[in-house]
């Protein structure tokens, strides 16, 4: 018999919060700006989770360095920005298809946990990350891509609306979060900051509407 003293949650479950989509923050570091020609070099993803009160929080980060796919190019200037050393002995890069499987496996696990139908990419300038992700999926003929092919949540738009800031560093600081410029342009660091920014805005928004 159901305990009548238990108050059911008033917030929608994750499966309904974003119309069946699981938000997953993705950040990529690349060999340039052209996803059809430049190499994918590093990728990090963070599924967004929900606690018992309905508040969103960043889940566990999964990341990997990626071996440049055959036929892709690398602009040396991009390596100056990211600080990636391709032949570093501790880079431990994976071939592109194995890198995708490494990233996508925890995404599918979290989708199943929350009964979501698809993942939706969250990023800062999100279509940049999505285009490189889709290009890698196409190159490798990967068949189990959990992400929506074109829909995204872009924290550039969200931060511009919430704080009047569109640069990630300034948006993060405007949200009251810490930012270390020395750690920027790492896929893991940028993904973590983007995840906290997304959660901060989406958690505050219902309170602003109600108020």
Swiss-Prot record:
Cysteine pairs bridged by disulfides in the record: none
GO cellular component term of the entry, any: cytosol
Any one GO MF annotation of this record: 3'-5' exonuclease activity
Keyword hit for Nuclease: yes
CC cofactor: Mg(2+)
Enzyme Commission number: 3.1.13.-
Residue ranges annotated for the Exonuclease domain, each copy included: 24-198
GO biological process terms, semicolon-separated: DNA replication proofreading; tRNA processing
Superkingdom, taxonomy of origin: Bacteria
InterPro entries reported for this sequence: Exonuclease_RNaseT/DNA_pol3, RNase_T, RNaseH-like_sf, RNaseH_sf
Active site feature: 185 (proton donor/acceptor)
Record's keyword terms, sorted: Exonuclease, Hydrolase, Magnesium, Metal-binding, Nuclease, tRNA processing
Free-text comment on the cofactor: Binds two Mg(2+) per subunit. The active form of the enzyme binds two Mg(2+) ions in its active site. The first Mg(2+) forms only one salt bridge with the protein.
Pfam family, one: RNase_T
Positions annotated to bind Mg(2+) 1: 27
Residues bound to Mg(2+) 2: 27, 29, 185, 190
Annotated site (Important for substrate binding and specificity): 33, 128, 150
Enzyme class: hydrolase
Record-linked HAMAP family: RNase_T
Homology family: Belongs to the RNase T family.
Record's subunit section: Homodimer.
Known role: Trims short 3' overhangs of a variety of RNA species, leaving a one or two nucleotide 3' overhang. Responsible for the end-turnover of tRNA: specifically removes the terminal AMP residue from uncharged tRNA (tRNA-C-C-A). Also appears to be involved in tRNA biosynthesis.
Full protein name: Ribonuclease T
